[in-house]
Amino acid sequence: MSAQQQKNLSESAQVDQQSVQPFPRSQKVYVQGSRPDIRVPMREISLDVTPTDFGGEINAPVTVYDTSGPYTDPNVTIDVRKGLSDVRSAWIEDRGDTEKLPGLSSEFGQRRLNDAELSAMRFAHVRNPRRARAGHNVSQMHYAKKGIITPEMEFVAIRENMKLAEAREAGLLNEQHAGHSFGASIPKEITPEFVRSEVARGRAIIPANINHVELEPMIIGRNFLVKINGNIGNSALGSSIEEEVAKLTWGIRWGSDTVMDLSTGKHIHETREWIIRNSPVPIGTVPIYQALEKVGGIAEDLTWELFRDTLIEQAEQGVDYFTIHAGVLLRYVPLTAKRVTGIVSRGGSIMAKWCLAHHKENFLYTHFEDICEIMKAYDVSFSLGDGLRPGSIADANDAAQFGELETLGELTKIAWKHDVQCMIEGPGHVPMQLIKENMDKQLECCDEAPFYTLGPLTTDIAPGYDHITSGIGAAMIGWFGCAMLCYVTPKEHLGLPNKDDVKTGIITYKIAAHAADLAKGHPGAQIRDNALSKARFEFRWEDQFNLGLDPDTARAFHDETLPKDSAKVAHFCSMCGPKFCSMKITQEVRDYAKEQRIDAVDLDAEQGMQAKAAEFKAQGSQLYQKV
């Protein structure tokens, strides 16, 4: 995008048209809570009737979790220049513990606002920020500890259940394998009280800054559905504000539960405002990235005062969680010297360099309680960064990684003392046999605070395919108890991801998260699998496509060899053809048995006898065989 186009963004910005298309045979449904303004969005997939001898068997619609916000609702007009509608202001105002500020508090925010050259690119509909009244704490954890069920908690409970009671009544929960949850306590139904208790205990967080009023609340915790995060952000090498907003809307269409804005290039402040105002999902950032930009990229010049102003700037915009690398301590840095890949975290390397340059302890660590004071005034959640995570499987589970993890556990308890919500970031690159140890160590050190991992990548030999190497580890650690998985795209280690890469990474991680939910035995997790399997056996091709995580790709693959509409009702696919389709043959056997009134058990027994007879003849009809 040219400088002139970027300059006129406030007039020209348009929503990404691909992101606002409703999914095929799907409709947006809203489940109302205890008050009219609690309207929880879900996606309902309609299914075709199964033909029978008696007119047809109705297949109940399948309800699925929906992260796309109003973008896929055809009844909503989207204008990214105005942002999304307000969801939460009434809830926040009703609590009576916040105040509207006359303007921005941060010095940097004020300077950007007064810079006339930025006026055309600036988001035009900025509200005055809100902050806790003096002496008040406005975090969801604070309310939860006081026994208060907030509208956000009720919203989350309804959302996690996905009409579970209706599914149970319809008998859709009868066919699900028992899971193994490794100590997680997943109830048969998620209630608002259960949400409150998990947030109060620190086992779950609801990232929901009071200045992100467009947010549709969600929850991150091991006793809830496994979530995924997608990363976006510009850099000095390119990408525009409009492209980043398009990546946001594209990512949440395919299932990104949260989005991190990792921008490091120009106009970080303006980019973030556009993203938050158009985001129905929580937005996370790494504030040290912007702080570094403010000092010209020289880590040694960072100061606590500058960083504090950056936290306030971002909190007043509405960032829901901050990655803070407060566990990178001076004494841990030498432990990385003999690593194959050293320190690979950007935030970790920045703070390590600062510590060595000044030979002082990490100022994020020494000022941690000061940071807590800011967080609880806006309800920003901690995502305690793993600045010493392994960047290769050779470095996995070493002294530096686990030393930092122990420190993150100490910091978690300090955050909880201030009633600040907190999750813990994890690796990284870990071979499969060491993944369980990571999860167990985190649960032990951090007292079950939610774990949030990047993968982990299980091997280092597949550049271009690291969405797969990491998807393997993500599924495993999600099963073991990890609450949120940060996606990896095919471009990992190679370049900045484009829209296609974002989609590939998200779909890969939706598979991993869902596989983990199945393995944990999350109630209702298997409903969609069962519906798709039934559609596959009955050759309901459109239902197969629409029930999948990516209907577009499934339909395109089918149409590569069978493009005609008539193929959408064919009782075979292009892999086996009409004569060798196992499911078609099975249906014919069933039909034959029905016509001949042969019991299925008898038919199976007869087929087994015939198979054994053929095996006996093939071995030479000898009564005894040599061994």
Curated annotation (Swiss-Prot):
Signal peptide: none annotated. GO terms for molecular function: 4 iron, 4 sulfur cluster binding; carbon-carbon lyase activity; zinc ion binding. Substrate binds at N231, M260, Y289, H325, S345, R346, G347, D386, G387, L388, R389, E425, Y452. It comes from the Bacteria. It holds the Pfam family ThiC_Rad_SAM. It catalyses: 5-amino-1-(5-phospho-beta-D-ribosyl)imidazole + S-adenosyl-L-methionine = 4-amino-2-methyl-5-(phosphooxymethyl)pyrimidine + CO + 5'-deoxyadenosine + formate + L-methionine + 3 H(+). Binds 1 [4Fe-4S] cluster per subunit. The cluster is coordinated with 3 cysteines and an exchangeable S-adenosyl-L-methionine. Zn(2+) binds at H429, H493. Pathway: Cofactor biosynthesis; thiamine diphosphate biosynthesis. [4Fe-4S] cluster binds at C573, C576, C581. One of its GO terms (biological process) is thiamine diphosphate biosynthetic process. InterPro entries: ThiC (IPR037509), ThiC-associated_dom (IPR025747), ThiC/Bza_core_dom (IPR038521), ThiC/BzaA/B (IPR002817). Residues 1-21 have a biased composition (Polar residues). Its cofactor is [4Fe-4S] cluster. Keywords: 4Fe-4S, Iron, Iron-sulfur, Lyase, Metal-binding, S-adenosyl-L-methionine, Thiamine biosynthesis, Zinc. Residues 1-32 are annotated as: Disordered. Its EC number is 4.1.99.17. GO terms for cellular component: cytosol. Belongs to the ThiC family. Catalyzes the synthesis of the hydroxymethylpyrimidine phosphate (HMP-P) moiety of thiamine from aminoimidazole ribotide (AIR) in a radical S-adenosyl-L-methionine (SAM)-dependent reaction. Homodimer. This is Phosphomethylpyrimidine synthase. It comes from Ectopseudomonas mendocina (strain ymp) (Pseudomonas mendocina).
